[in-house]
From Swiss-Prot:
Reactions performed catalytically: 3-dehydroquinate = 3-dehydroshikimate + H2O
GO terms, molecular function: 3-dehydroquinate dehydratase activity
Active site, renumbered: H118, K143
Positions bound to 3-dehydroquinate: E30, W31, R32, R62, R186, Q209
InterPro entries named in the record: Aldolase_TIM, DHquinase_I, Type-I_3-dehydroquinase
The keyword RNA-binding is assigned to this record: no
Name under which the protein is recorded: 3-dehydroquinate dehydratase
Gene transcribed to yield this protein: aroD
Family of this protein: Belongs to the type-I 3-dehydroquinase family.
């Protein structure tokens, strides 16, 4: 299970001031570019990709439709993704599939897609269908993050992850049940079949997230003989 840590600089200066030494134990960096105004993203990109050269990087534009900070039309969303991909070819590109389904055809040639679904209100009743539809598209990674209302919601996400991973062993999944009651899902990836877990360095960006140091301690405990 790899540890993913988001970075969200709000300016070029903040990007340049990131202390790289704090990320030594991080497996994957997620650049949450939605912390920036749309017109600043291309200008800040060189600082991010140069600073984290040697790390795997996810480029993410988390829109307000799925709990992020930026408002983009479908055309603007795809244009920014394509521009970043053509210049920097990041290891992974997050694509909010259900929020931008109309333009997904323009992404079919991308081998590095993380097809994602985020719901900060609930764990929808059709969660199995969401797993199924994303899996059928065979992206690099299927990512699902939903908000539980009770313990059963947490168990449903974990069980569906295990079930779909068993049937599709070559598909990478990154799933999480958010909030305090869902926190166990962040640690159980080796059992459920979720290959990524998300932690934070300075401030949490999702309910239930924990720090890198806390995640490392838990992983060490779980990995011990």
């Amino acid at each position: 299970m790899k540890i993913v840590v988001p970075v969200m600089p709000r300016s070029l200066e903040e990007a340049q001031e990131i202390d790289l030494s704090k990320f030594d134990s991080v497996d994957i960096i997620e650049w949450r570019a939605d912390a920036l105004p749309k017109d600043d993203i291309i200008n800040v990109a060189p600082a991010i990709f140069e600073k984290f050269a040697g790390h795997e990087i996810i480029f993410t534009l988390r829109t307000t439709r799925e709990g992020g900070n930026i408002v983009l039309s479908d055309a603007e969303y795809v244009e920014l993704i394509q521009k970043i991909n053509s210049i920097y070819n990041p290891d992974y590109i997050d694509f909010e599939y259900f929020s931008h389904k109309e333009v997904f055809q323009e992404m079919l040639e991308f081998p590095n897609l993380v097809l994602s679904y985020h719901n900060f209100q609930e764990t929808p009743e059709n969660i199995m269908e969401i797993f199924s539809e994303l899996t059928a598209l065979a992206p690099r990674v299927v990512k699902i993050a939903v908000m539980p209302k009770n313990e059963q919601d947490v168990l449903d996400v974990m069980n569906y992850t295990r079930g779909f991973k068993t049937i599709n062993p070559d598909q990478v999944y990154a799933t999480v049940s958010m909030s305090k009651i869902g926190r166990i899902s962040r640690f159980a990836g080796d059992v459920t079949g979720s290959s990524w877990t998300f932690a934070y360095l300075d401030s949490s960006i999702a309910p239930g997230q924990i720090t890198i140091s806390e995640m490392k301690r838990v992983k060490a405990l779980l990995d011990a003989d």
